[in-house]
Structures are given as structure tokens and as C-alpha cells.
A protein has these predicted regions:
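Sec-dependent N-terminal signal peptides
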Residues: 5-14
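Formylglycine-dependent sulfatase
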Residues: 13-173
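N-terminal secretory signal peptides that target proteins for export/translocation
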Residues: 1-2
Length: 173
């Protein structure tokens, strides 16, 4: 397993809503950072992600402590190392009482949702609004895309800021 396994490509994007910034966080497993055009890639066409990166805020230097799917995702969502959350080895669940970004953003009025690959648990540690797990499906599943559009439209209509994590599975080697 290489250091590229868990996280190598992601874009952090923000918009203004109700005076608070919206957050869209795109991540993919087993994908090199320079695959996406926003980070210099030439082989894959990613015009919409490139625009999000240009117009928003992105991380150009970010690191994970473990290059495995579940430990990394739980580290990202909790801000704590896998040794603290108990998520080693891969496919492990966090220890009870682990707090995630959902616990911190919800009291601030944010809706916090997860679209795509989840690979985290238990649910009380990561109580995302689930928009659909595409880990065994094609990412462009029409039902999931409709659910995501409804989520975004609802946030806009109610002027709720949101934090949306999009976890692709398609890039797995």
C-alpha cells in the first residue's frame, strides 16, 4: 500500500450563504493529486471541479497520518489521529464518544451531509445526513443526484449554510 491510498486528491470549496461559508469537500481514494486539472493534471477532464477550486478555497498542502480508507476518513471528519479514534486497522470503527465535524457545525446552524463513500462509524460519532452511498454504484446515479440537488435547493431556500462531503469510489485502482 502506498502513501497515495487514502487521500491524494481533494478540493476544498467555499461559498457565502447567510453570512456563513458553505463547504464542499471532494475526496477520492487511490487518485494522485495531479490527476485533476485544478492541480495540474492533463489526462482527466474535470472542468467543474477545476472551477470550484479556482473560485473557492483549496488545500494545496494537506497530509494524513495513515494511508488507508477508513482511518483516513475518520481522521478527516474528527480531526483526531486514528490512534486516538481507534480506527486501526482499516475497516475499524471509532471509539464511542468520538466527536466529528458534524457535532461542531450543527450547533452553528449548518446542515452536514455525506454523499458517496462513507466508510466510517459508528453512526453516533459521524451523524451525517446521508445523501446516498455510491460505493457499489456508478457515481452519477440519478436517484442520488436528485437527492443531492434537493439537499442543496433546501439549503438555499432556507438559507442554511451547509457542509457537503463528496466521497468518490470510482477512482479505485
Amino acid at each position: 500500500m502506498t502513501s497515495k491510498t487514502a487521500l491524494l486528491s481533494f478540493t476544498f470549496f467555499t461559498l457565502i450563504a447567510s453570512g456563513k461559508k458553505n463547504v464542499i469537500f471532494v475526496l477520492a481514494d487511490d487518485m494522485s493529486r495531479d490527476t485533476w486539472g485544478a492541480f495540474g493534471g492533463k489526462d482527466c477532464l474535470t472542468p467543474n471541479i477545476d472551477q470550484l477550486a479556482r473560485d473557492g478555497t483549496r488545500f494545496d498542502r494537506a497530509y494524513c497520518t495513515v494511508a488507508m480508507c477508513a482511518p483516513f476518513r475518520q481522521e478527516l471528519y474528527s480531526g483526531r489521529s486514528p490512534w486516538r479514534t481507534g480506527t486501526l486497522p482499516n475497516h475499524s470503527k471509532s471509539v464511542r464518544g468520538t466527536k466529528s465535524i458534524v457535532h461542531y457545525l450543527k450547533p452553528l446552524g449548518y446542515r452536514v451531509a455525506l454523499l458517496g463513500k462513507s466508510h466510517v462509524g459508528p453512526a453516533e460519532c459521524y451523524p451525517f445526513e446521508k445523501l446516498g452511498d455510491v460505493s457499489k454504484q456508478v457515481d452519477a446515479n440519478p436517484e442520488i443526484m436528485k437527492k443531492t440537488k434537493t439537499f442543496l435547493d433546501d439549503c438555499k431556500k432556507t438559507e442554511n449554510p451547509f457542509c457537503l462531503f463528496i466521497g468518490s469510489h470510482d477512482s479505485h485502482a
